[in-house]
Design a protein with these regions (language model features):
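Conserved, structured core segments of small domains
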Residues: 1-114
Length: 114
């Protein structure tokens, strides 16, 4: 587990603007719509990364990270990836998980839903 946590942490350091990573392959996810699970909301810093990774291992095997300029913190989330054609399902999932936005990886844009 420590090796996986360290690997994701290192990946976040070389991707300071954000990333979406399949933690089984350690390869970036470049297509689809990323939606965070509520259970890992407000996870920031390396100390929260273990919890995020544990959740991801039990669910979608994908972790997202992004830097919030308002709080000056790097956040991590366990995320679920939907096909772009499943945008309605992704939005419903996001609402059920109290998310303010989803991220379109294919077009590199945030989609606000609230």
């Amino acid at each position: 587990m420590k090796q996986l946590t360290d690997g994701v942490w290192e990946y976040s350091l070389i991707n300071p603007n954000g990333f979406t990573l399949n933690i089984e392959t350690m390869k970036p996810v470049k297509y689809g719509i990323s939606v965070a699970y509520e259970e890992t909301q407000d996870s920031f810093g390396k100390e929260s990364l273990n919890r995020v990774i544990n959740h991801a291992l039990e669910h979608s095997k994908t972790v997202g990270g992004w830097f919030d300029t308002d709080s000056n913190r790097y956040y991590f989330d366990s995320v679920k990836i939907f096909k772009n054609s499943e945008i309605d399902i992704a939005i419903e999932f996001a609402k059920n998980h109290n998310q303010l936005a989803i991220y379109d990886l294919t077009n590199l844009e945030e989609i606000r839903i609230k």
